[in-house]
Amino acid sequence: MDFVSKYMSCLSSWGLDLQPGLQSVGAAVLLATGGLFLASRVLTFVRVLLSLFVLPGKPLRSFGPKGSWAVVTGASDGLGKEFALQLARAGFNIVLVSRTASKLATLAEEITAKHSVQTRTLAMDFAANDDTDYEDLKTLVDGLDVSILINNVGKSHDIPVPFALTPEDEMTDIVTINCLGTLRATQLVIPGMMQRRRGLVLTMGSFGGLLPTPLLATYSGSKAFLQQWSTSLGSELEPYGITVELVQAYLITSAMSKVRRTSALIPSPRAFVSSVLSKIGRNGGSPTYSYSSSPYWSHGLMAYFLTCVLQPMGKLVVGQNRTMHEAIRKRALRKAEREKGKKST
């Protein structure tokens, strides 16, 4: 009752002297509101834990039968390569799309040697935005039972850089590859899925799309675009039985991240892709984002804390993000100077 006494004193100090009965009702309303708010937070966190650690995702076979096809963009390295390998292990034929023909050929040979599936390859540079390339992709997938599309192709900045200093070609490539490339590839593949009334469209997002990221402004903006686009697309395609999911990811060991050593927060491509494919349809650490997921356990806990506890758009969070990337930029520039000095000697 100490709370009620303090509540009544507070009302009196504001000149709001209510009748005792009304004071009790007001106190009860405040207690109930606070209790409901706390209970909702607890239930949300329990949902996150169940999604990350207990509940399974949709089985891959629900998207298409054995022998159907999965299209993987950005397939020659890192996450794209791992998606292709694990989907082939699950019995899907694989269409590999990436820039370097020799890498695609090597991966196709590896897949067919390990698994009894078919592969097809298309070497195309998404940065070129060449209509002929997309016509070739359409020709390649037309007539195939494409059950899964993995939109993995992407590009970031070489190092953190202020927007005013961002090279124009780098800025253009990021937007063209991350946004336009993903949209055009998806628009080619989904008509068949809509006709068959099943399928999975999985797009690689980033924490950069959740949190404004100074010194990676163009990349962050491109991933925020994909977040909104994918969520909208998910609602459009749900009546057709198609699952659309954007995967929100922190760092993963890859050429793009320039991180080589794994840790609790930074998984290998194999571990990350395994978590993604086993949790399709589960939000993981992103309970407030429909048609989205943070399935890897540490990324999910981070996403929950950042989006449900903190204010991701607030000055404090954005400022800390800027400070971190300013430090990364300084280290990268010092490293470049050292390497330049070694070459000159």
Curated annotation (Swiss-Prot):
E.C. number: 1.1.1.330
Cellular component, GO annotation: endoplasmic reticulum membrane
Chief location category: endoplasmic reticulum
Catalytic center residues: 219, 223
Cited function: Component of the microsomal membrane bound fatty acid elongation system, which produces the 26-carbon very long-chain fatty acids (VLCFA) from palmitate. Catalyzes the reduction of the 3-ketoacyl-CoA intermediate that is formed in each cycle of fatty acid elongation. VLCFAs serve as precursors for ceramide and sphingolipids.
PANTHER family documented for this protein: HYDROXYSTEROID DEHYDROGENASE-LIKE PROTEIN 1, VERY-LONG-CHAIN 3-OXOOACYL-COA REDUCTASE
Listed name of the protein: Very-long-chain 3-oxoacyl-CoA reductase
